[in-house]
A protein has these predicted regions:
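Conserved acetyl-CoA-binding loop-helix of GNAT-fold acetyltransferases
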Residues: 75-88, 113
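Conserved catalytic-core motifs of GNAT/GCN5-like acyltransferases
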Residues: 99-101, 117-134
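Conserved N-terminal entry element of GNAT/NAT acetyltransferase domains
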Residues: 1-9, 137
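Conserved GNAT acetyl-CoA-binding A-motif
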Residues: 90-103
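A conserved beta-strand-loop-helix scaffold within acyl/acetyltransferase catalytic domains
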Residues: 31-32, 44-46, 53-62, 67
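Conserved active-site tyrosine of GNAT-family acetyltransferases
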Residues: 17, 111-112, 116
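A short, internal acetyl-CoA/4′-phosphopantetheine-binding micro-motif in the GNAT/acyltransferase core
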Residues: 67-74
């Protein structure tokens, strides 16, 4: 056996590792219910993105990976429309729950307003004095 370390993980190394991990996980999970991106985007009349949400289905869960709203339209309901639409699509695809994480300077109050509840807060992440919050919602 040989142990190596690198700062430059190659696509091939990543794929080799993930192939092994997926094979192991397949013993316990229905991988057909994993994957499948959900993308919801709001654009202006010129096609410029005003906001968007990208999530992925993982079993019975919608994992919200990214949510962004342009500063000029924050507070106008765009974020709420994005998340509501993603939740509806996730329900249609069989999801029963949603999970999102956010850092203290981001959008915890927004998610709580949408019905999400904090399950855990990781202190001093990514830096001293900040927190990473994990929130869930029953769909």
């Amino acid at each position: 056996m040989h142990l190596s370390i690198t700062d430059n993980v190659t696509a091939e190394e990543k794929e080799e590792l993930l192939t092994g991990l997926r094979a192991y996980n397949a013993q316990f999970l229905d991988l057909a219910t994993f994957g499948g991106d959900i993308g919801v985007y709001m654009r202006d009349d010129n096609g410029v993105m005003l906001g968007g949400l990208i999530g992925v289905r993982k079993g019975d869960w919608l994992n919200i990976d990214y949510l962004w709203v342009r500063d000029s339209v924050r507070g106008t309901g765009v974020g709420s429309q994005l998340i509501k639409t993603a939740e509806e699509e996730a329900r249609r695809k069989g999801c029963r729950h949603a999970l999102v994480d956010t850092v203290s300077f981001q959008a915890r109050p927004f998610y709580e307003k949408q019905g999400y509840q904090v399950q855990m807060s990781l202190q001093d992440y990514p830096y001293q004095g900040m927190q990473r919050h994990y929130l869930t919602k029953h769909l």
